Amino acid sequence: MEELLPDRQVWANMDPEERMLAAATAFTHICAGQGEGDVRREAQSIQYDPYSKASIAPGKRPTLPVQLQYPHVESNVTSETVSEASQRLRKPVMKRKVLRRKPDGEVLVTDESIISESESGTENDQGLWDLRQRLMNVQFQEDKESSFDISQKFNPPHEYQGISQDQLICSLQREGMGSPAYEQDLIVASRPKSFILPKLDQLSRNRGKTDRVARYFEYKRDWDSIRLPGEDHRKELRWGVREQMLCRAEPQSKPQHIYVPNNYLVPTEKKRSALRWGVRCDLANGVIPRKLPFPLSPS
């Protein structure tokens, strides 16, 4: 506190208003170095964060007061520290988000990320705490060496003016990640897995057995539960067709066929033999036929 204040001679020659301004500036430097005194930050930490439940690391991570770097502010120590911190945080992590839709149309987004063992536990918390202490020391040294005001030191762009340092860091990280905000709101704490492995004993015991009836009813239940919009129920459609078939008018009776007897007699061998026998008898008795089939020609 004494190092940030001016000398005793200058302090004695200053007006009360200038003394208050210098004390307030020094106090602001100290609060900025320790990350305290920001009411909006405390209110933001109390608010409910739905993404914290589905975050990769368990528990609440400590806030890192990272020093913002702009073109007119140069610091080799801070850049080396930030690069070292980024290398430490870059660990093999498989990020995976699964989107599911329930039969009622509700959307469920779950985070199934896989983390390494070194990133979880007390080691991660201890490393983050050490990194926070180093950054706080570097920032305090820079505040002690600098002689210009905080308003001149931090000159963010026009669209980021009027917000605190932590909010500016969060907004920049959000823009760098590019993840939409509505996905974070849909993440829940249950986190069901996308695939559940079957038990080995059941798999080996029921490998050769397949209940076709149970499989049919299972598929039928799934088919009935998941329907396309505008699809008619097949059972109702079948019953409607059956009612139309039953209500159809009866066909007209066809006219009966009238039987006409046939008097035609087919000549048989018996009748021909009787005719031949009669002709033979007439020739033997000298009886002339009544009508000749052809005229007799004179000989």
UniProtKB/Swiss-Prot annotation:
Its main location: cytoplasm. One of its GO terms (biological process) is cilium assembly. The keyword Cytoplasm applies. The keyword Cytoplasm applies. The modification Phosphoserine is found at S179. It is found in: Cytoplasm; Cell projection, Cilium; Cytoplasm, Cytoskeleton, Microtubule organizing center, Centrosome, Centriole. InterPro entries: Centriolar_ciliogenesis_assoc, HYLS1, HYLS1_C_dom. It comes from the Eukaryota. It holds the Pfam family HYLS1_C. Keywords: Cell projection, Cilium biogenesis/degradation, Cytoplasm, Cytoskeleton, Phosphoprotein. One of its GO terms (cellular component) is centriole. PANTHER family: CENTRIOLAR AND CILIOGENESIS-ASSOCIATED PROTEIN HYLS1, HYDROLETHALUS SYNDROME PROTEIN 1. Plays a role in ciliogenesis. Belongs to the HYLS1 family. This is Centriolar and ciliogenesis-associated protein HYSL1. The gene is HYLS1.
